[in-house]
């Protein structure tokens, strides 16, 4: 605990604000090209094969992005749009791929929360 004199000499420094999505460079979304599409396993209490893609963005940065929803059509050289938003049980995955935009198809037969998965309204 500093003394009053020490605080007068050198005041407290505010904590620097850390950017949670540096690859987006302040933009809401960014376009990129898939360089690798693969599956990975989550952290300890959970168990699954999560679908992720390594994406080279227009900013030149490579980011690991999660592919939400059941089934996808992504492969190498697919052009995708990414947004911020981490996946809690996948370390290093800080971005989501937007479904139903550019080369990514929407989730088939999706009835609820369709806008998040790029699914059209069922007839």
From Swiss-Prot:
Assembly: Part of the 30S ribosomal subunit. Contacts proteins S8 and S17. May interact with IF1 in the 30S initiation complex.
Family designation: Belongs to the universal ribosomal protein uS12 family.
Organism of derivation: Caulobacter sp. (strain K31)
SUPFAM superfamilies assigned to the protein according to its UniProt record, in alphabetical order: Nucleic acid-binding proteins
Superkingdom field: Bacteria
In-chain residues carrying the UniProt-annotated modification 3-methylthioaspartic acid: 89
One annotated GO molecular function: rRNA binding
InterPro entries: NA-bd_OB-fold, Ribosomal_uS12, Ribosomal_uS12_bac
Name this protein carries in UniProt: Small ribosomal subunit protein uS12
């Amino acid at each position: 605990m500093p003394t009053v004199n020490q605080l007068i000499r050198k005041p407290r420094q505010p904590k620097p604000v850390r950017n949670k999505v540096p690859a987006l460079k302040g933009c809401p979304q960014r376009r990129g090209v898939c360089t690798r599409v693969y599956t990975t396993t989550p952290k300890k209490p959970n168990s699954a094969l999560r679908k992720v893609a390594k994406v080279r963005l227009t900013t030149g940065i490579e980011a690991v992005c999660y592919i939400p929803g059941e089934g996808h059509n992504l492969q190498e050289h697919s052009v995708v749009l990414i947004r911020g938003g981490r996946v809690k049980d996948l370390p290093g995955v800080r971005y989501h791929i937007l479904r139903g935009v550019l080369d990514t198809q929407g989730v088939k037969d999706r009835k609820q929360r369709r806008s998040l998965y790029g699914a059209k309204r069922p007839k």
